[in-house]
Amino acid sequence: MDYTPLIEKRRQRLEELETVIAEPDFFNDQKKASEIMREHRRLKELMETWDSLNATEQQLADNQELAKTDDPELAELAALEIPELEAALEKLRSDLQ
């Protein structure tokens, strides 16, 4: 499933919230400010997790390719990191659910 449109929508909302938070009178309504800050924090954490997931997926793919190279030392180093990357991916996927 392609989550790109959903993630982009969330990223746009995060940018909107950051613009609102930057306004000088943002804290005049404490209740509204608190709600916005809570939503901002949740979206920021989501985007950070999503970005980490993508970076880890790319690193895993790179390591899988490097593990097939003719350089035995490089292949071994890359292969050693694969289980760690797979575990990190599982955790990130779990965090997104």
Language model features with spans:
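Charged, heptad-repeat coiled-coil alpha-helices that serve as long linker/dimerization "arms"
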Residues: 1-97
